[in-house]
A protein has these predicted regions:
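Fe-S-dependent hydro-lyases/dehydratases of central metabolism
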Residues: 1-891
C-alpha cells in the first residue's frame, strides 16, 4: 500500500505534559536504511516527503530516492516539496495579491468557485520595501519619511488591507515595523511548527518559501527556506507543491575563530567569494565544523542571508544549543524552545560536535584567516581587502569610464552657505541598512562604539556624505539607545530614517541638489558604502557608479573619510581637535568592548516591540477599506490595475505554438541581474514609464519607484529592461534600455520596439551570457518580458529563481551548448530565430534553434532545454503556473 512508509513512521513525542504526533525519521530508516549521515537540510526534505506521501504527488519511490542520495551524494529526481508557510514583502507582495484578485475574477468568469482562491497555508506579508530616505541627518527624518511613505503608498496600502480581510490565513505586518527577514528571524520563525489536526497536536519542521531572495536568512535559525518568484509563491500558498530536483549539498566547514577586529560582515564576504568561485547555483550549502560552537546565531543569519549572492538555494545551519539560546533571547516561549530541542534530537536534525555528514563536495575556512573586507564596486562576490580598496576603486574608475583619475578635478559647490570641493571618488552615500547586518547586534554595537570614539575626538562626517540608519527592527533602536550610542550616531548624521530596506534596494532617495549638480558637472565617479547585500550597477542611486558592501562600523568610518581613494589601514580618517591625525585603528572597538555592549540586548526588548506587531501606526489604523471578496478596480489608478495575464484564458490550454521568425529584442552580456531586467528604483521622466505616468496626470515628484508600481502592469512593462546601466550589445556605446527595431537601424526604447513588433505579430527573443537573471527573486523580470512578447531566452546559464520564473510565465529558457556563446557564433542581434516542435519538448532535451543571418545564411544551434522537471513542463504547456492552478481549481 502506498501509504505504508508514512504510516509506519508515525510516532509520538512527549514534551513536558504535551504529546505531539510526528513522522519519525529513525522509524522510517528501518525501511530506508541508515540515514545518520544524510545532511541535516536533506533530513528536513525527507520528513516533508514522508508527511505528504499520498502515492500521487509524493510516492514511496521519491522517499527512497532521497534516502539513497547518500550512496553517491547526488540524485536525478524531481520531488514535490510543500513548505509550511509563505513570507512576502510589499514590492513582491502587491503584485502577488493583484494576481490572486485577478485569479478570482478569472475563476468567476469561467464558472468556478472564487472561495477556492485562498491561501491553504499561513502567509505573512511584511511592508518594508516602500520607505525612502527623503530626509536624513536630523531628528525629524524618521517621522517625515514615514509621512511621505504613507502619502505616496496610500492606494497600495488600502489594497493590502483589503487583501488581509479578503483572503484567509493572510496577515500583514504594517509599515514602520521592520524588514521581513529580520521580523521572520526575531519573531515569525518557529524552527519547529505545531498545529492541531483532528484533535491531535502534530509537530514538523518550520519551512517556508518567500517572495524575496534573502528569505534564506532564516536558515541561520535552522529553518529551511529560500526565495521563489511571486508566481511560484502564489501557487504554493494555493496548495501547489514546489517542484524541485533533489539538490546536491555542498558542505562548508568552519573552523577556528575570527581574529580581534574582524566582523561577521568580513566573514560573510569571504564565504560569498569562496562559494561563488566553487559554484553552488541550484545547490544547498550546509555549514558544519567546530567553528559553529562559538559562532553566534546573528552571525549565522548574516551568512545565510547572502545565499543568493553566493548563488546557493540556501545556506543551512542545523539546530543546536546556540539556536535555543537565541530563541530564548528573542522572546520565544519556553514551551516552544523545549519542543525545538526535543524534536530536533529525536529526528537526528540536531547538530552534535564532530558531525561529518556526507556532502556532494566540501570547502573549509579557518575563520582566523579572514581579513577586514569590502565587496565592490558592482558585484557582491568581488571581495576586496580593506587596504586594497583605493586600488580597486581606481581600476574600476578607469575601466568603466575610460579615463584616469587625475583627469577629474574636484568640483566646487555651495551648500548651506558654505563652499566645498567635491572630489572624484567621494563617498556620497553611507548607509547602515539591510537585514544582512542590522539583525546582528555585534556589528551594530561596533558602529555605535566607533561613532562614540570619533565624536569624542572631534571627528565629523564629510559634508557631501548622505548618512542614514535604517534598522531591520525596532529592537535595534532599543539596544543602541540602551547602550548610549544613539546620540553619537546622530551627531555623525546616522539618524534613524525608517525601519525598512531603504538604500539596500535602491530607496536611497535624492542626493542634495548641489551634490547631484557637481557630480554631473565634473562627470565624477562617486561611491556608496552600505551594510547591505547587493551593489549592482545603478541599484543604489543612478548617479553613483561604484557601490561597496561593508560592515556597519566601516560604513561610519567611510562617512568620516568621505573618499574611496583613502586607504583606511594607513591614511588618517581626519584630525582631532588638536589637529593631530586620527586613524581607523585609534577608534576601532575591541572585541571586549563589543561583547560588553551586546550584553545590553534583552528579551524584554523583543517582547515590547513584537507585542503588537500586526497593529501598525495610527495612520495605518485609519485606512478605510471596502469589505468584499473581489476587489473594486479603479480604471484611473496608476498603482493597482487588473493584470492582463488571464485575459482570454480558457478552461483547457491551447497547444504550445512554435516560434517562427522571432526577432532579438536584446543581446546582453554576463551577470545580467533581475535589477537590469526590471529595475526597482527611480523612474526617469523621459522613459516610457515616466511618459506614461505623466500622461495620466502624475507629477514627477509623485512618481515613486518601479518597485512601488508593481501592481500596475502598464508601468512595469514599460520599465522592463529600463535600467539606466543595462548595455544592449545591439546598440554599442549606448547605456540604458534601448534597442533597434529590425530590420531598421534607428535606436529606440526597448518598450517602443516591442510594441511595434507586437503590431507586426513578430515573436521576440533575448540572447544573454552567463548567470542570466541573478539577484532578486523578482517575478516582474519574467512578467515584463512576457508582456513585451518575448517567447524565448537563450543564455549561457541561468540563475535558479529567474529560470523558474520564466517557465512560470510561459517563456522558454534555453541554454547554449558548452563552449558556445553569442560571441563564438558571431551573433549581431540581426538574426531571425525559428524553434519548432515545441508541443513535444521534454525536460532537459536538446532543442534545435534555427538562426537565419541577415544575409540569409542559416545555422542550427543545439541548445539545452532548461525546463528541468515534468512539473515545470506542465506549467509551460499551460502557458504558466497560475493558469495551471486555475484550471486545477475548475476541475
Amino acid at each position: 500500500m502506498s501509504s505504508t512508509l508514512r504510516e509506519a513512521s508515525m510516532d509520538t513525542l512527549q514534551v513536558k505534559d504535551k504529546t505531539y504526533r510526528y513522522y519519525s525519521l529513525p522509524l522510517a530508516a528501518k525501511s530506508l536504511g541508515d540515514i545518520t549521515r544524510l545532511p541535516k537540510s536533506l533530513k528536513v526534505l525527507l520528513e516533508n516527503l514522508l508527511r505528504w506521501q499520498d502515492g500521487n504527488s509524493v510516492t514511496e519511490d521519491d522517499i527512497h530516492a532521497l534516502a539513497h542520495w547518500l550512496k553517491t551524494a547526488h540524485a536525478d529526481r524531481e520531488i514535490a516539496y510543500r513548505p509550511a508557510r509563505v513570507l512576502m514583502q510589499d514590492f513582491t507582495g502587491v503584485p502577488a495579491v493583484v494576481d490572486l484578485a485577478a485569479m478570482r475574477e478569472a475563476v468567476k468568469r469561467l464558472g468556478g468557485d472564487t472561495a477556492k482562491v485562498n491561501p491553504l497555508s499561513p502567509v505573512d506579508l511584511v511592508i518594508d520595501h516602500s520607505v525612502t530616505v527623503d530626509r536624513f541627518g536630523d531628528d525629524d527624518a524618521f517621522e517625515e519619511n514615514v509621512r511621505l511613505e504613507m502619502e505616496r503608498n496610500h492606494e497600495r496600502y488600502v489594497f493590502l488591507k483589503w487583501g488581509q480581510q479578503a483572503f484567509s490565513r493572510f496577515s500583514v505586518v504594517p509599515p514602520g515595523t521592520g524588514i521581513c527577514h529580520q521580523v521572520n528571524l526575531e519573531y515569525l520563525g518557529k524552527a519547529v511548527w505545531s498545529e492541531l489536526q483532528d484533535g491531535e497536536w502534530v509537530a514538523y519542521p518550520d519551512t517556508l518559501v518567500g517572495t524575496d531572495s534573502h528569505t534564506t536568512m532564516i536558515n541561520g535559525l535552522g529553518v529551511l527556506g529560500w526565495g521563489v518568484g511571486g508566481i511560484e509563491a502564489e501557487a504554493a500558498m494555493l496548495g501547489q507543491p514546489v517542484s524541485m530536483l533533489i539538490p546536491d549539498v555542498v558542505g562548508f566547514k568552519l573552523v577556528g575563530k575570527l581574529r580581534e577586529g574582524i566582523t561577521a560582515t568580513d566573514l560573510v564576504l569571504t564565504v560569498t567569494q569562496m562559494l561563488r568561485k566553487h559554484g553552488v547555483v541550484g545547490k544547498f550549502v550546509e555549514f558544519y565544523g567546530d567553528g559553529l560552537d562559538t559562532l553566534p546565531l546573528a552571525d549565522r543569519a548574516t551568512i545565510a542571508n547572502m545565499s543568493p549572492e553566493y548563488g546557493a538555494t540556501c545556506g543551512f545551519f542545523p539546530i543546536d544549543g546556540i539556536t535555543l539560546e537565541y530563541m530564548r533571547l528573542s522572546g520565544r516561549s519556553e514551551e516552544q524552545v523545549e519542543l525545538v530541542s526535543a524534536y530536533a534530537k529525536a529526528q537526528g536534525m540536531w547538530r552534535n560536535p564532530g558531525d561529518e555528514p556526507v556532502f556532494t563536495s566540501s570547502l573549509e575556512l579557518d575563520m582566523g584567516s579572514v581579513e577586514a573586507s569590502l565587496a565592490g564596486p558592482k558585484r557582491p562576490q568581488d571581495r576586496v581587502a580593506l587596504a586594497d580598496v583605493p586600488k580597486a576603486f581606481s581600476a574600476s574608475n578607469e575601466l568603466e569610464v575610460n579615463s584616469s583619475l587625475k583627469d577629474r578635478q574636484p568640483v566646487d559647490y555651495t551648500m548651506s552657505g558654505q563652499q566645498y570641493k567635491l572630489p572624484d571618488g567621494a563617498v556620497v552615500i553611507a548607509a547602515i541598512t539591510s537585514c544582512t547586518n542590522t539583525s546582528n547586534p555585534s556589528v551594530l554595537m561596533a558602529a555605535g562604539l566607533l561613532a562614540k570614539k570619533a565624536v569624542t575626538l572631534g571627528l565629523k562626517r564629510q559634508p557631501w556624505v548622505k548618512a542614514s540608519l535604517a534598522p531591520g527592527s525596532k529592537v535595534v533602536s532599543d539596544y543602541l539607545a540602551q547602550a548610549g550610542f544613539t546620540p553619537y550616531l546622530d551627531e555623525l548624521g546616522f539618524n534613524l530614517v525608517g525601519y525598512g530596506c531603504t538604500t539596500c534596494i535602491g530607496n536611497s532617495g535624492p542626493l542634495p541638489d548641489p551634490i547631484e549638480t557637481a557630480i554631473k558637472k565634473g562627470d565624477l565617479t562617486v561611491g556608496a558604502v552600505l551594510s547591505g547585500n547587493r551593489n549592482f550597477e545603478g541599484r543604489i542611486h543612478p548617479l553613483v557608479k561604484t557601490n561597496w558592501l561593508a560592515s556597519p562600523p566601516l560604513v561610519v568610518a567611510y562617512a568620516l573619510a568621505g573618499n574611496m581613494n583613502i586607504n583606511l589601514t594607513k591614511d588618517p580618517l581626519g584630525h582631532d581637535r588638536k589637529g593631530d591625525p586620527v586613524y581607523l585603528k585609534d577608534i576601532w572597538p575591541t572585541a571586549q568592548e563589543i561583547a560588553r555592549a551586546v550584553e545590553q540586548v534583552s528579551t524584554a526588548m523583543f517582547h515590547k516591540e513584537y507585542a503588537e506587531v500586526f497593529e501598525g501606526t495610527p495612520e495605518w489604523k485609519a485606512i478605510q477599506i471596502d469589505r468584499a471578496d473581489t476587489y473594486g478596480w479603479q480604471s484611473d489608478s496608476t498603482y493597482i490595475r487588473l493584470s492582463p495575464f488571464f485575459d482570454g484564458m480558457q478552461a483547457t490550454p491551447d497547444p504550445v505554438q512554435d516560434i517562427h521568425g522571432a526577432r532579438i529584442l536584446a543581446m546582453l552580456g554576463d551577470s545580467v541581474t533581475t535589477d537590469h531586467i526590471s529595475p526597482a528604483g527611480s523612474i526617469k521622466p523621459d522613459s516610457p514609464a515616466g511618459r506614461y505616468l505623466q500622461s495620466h496626470g502624475v507629477e514627477r515628484k509623485d512618481f515613486n519607484s518601479y518597485g512601488s508600481r508593481r501592481g500596475n502592469h502598464e508601468v512595469m512593462m514599460r520599465g522592463t529592461f529600463a535600467n539606466i546601466r543595462i548595455r544592449n550589445e545591439m546598440v554599442p556605446g549606448v547605456e540604458g534600455g534601448m534597442t533597434r527595431h529590425l530590420p531598421g537601424t534607428e535606436v529606440v526604447a526597448i518598450y517602443d520596439a516591442a510594441m511595434q513588433y507586437q503590431q507586426e505579430n513578430i515573436p521576440l527573443a533575448v540572447i544573454a551570457g552567463k548567470e542570466y537573471g541573478s539577484g532578486s527573486s523578482r517575478d516582474w523580470a519574467a512578467k515584463g518580458p512576457r508582456l513585451l512578447g518575448i517567447r524565448v531566452v537563450i543564455a549561457e546559464s541561468f540563475e535558479r529563481i529567474h529560470r523558474s520564473n520564466l517557465i512560470g510565465m510561459g517563456i522558454l529558457p534555453l541554454e547554449f551548448p558548452q563552449g558556445v556563446t553569442r560571441k563564438t557564433l558571431g551573433l549581431t542581434g540581426e538574426e531571425a530565430i525559428d524553434i519548432t516542435d515545441l508541443q513535444n519538448i521534454k525536460p532537459g532535451a536538446t532543442v534545435p534553434v534555427n538562426m537565419v543571418r541577415s544575409d540569409g545564411r542559416k545555422e542550427v544551434i543545439l541548445c539545452r532545454c532548461r525546463i528541468d522537471t515534468a512539473t515545470e513542463l506542465t506549467y509551460y504547456q499551460n502557458d504558466g503556473i497560475l493558469h495551471y492552478v486555475i484550471r486545477n481549481m475548475l476541475n
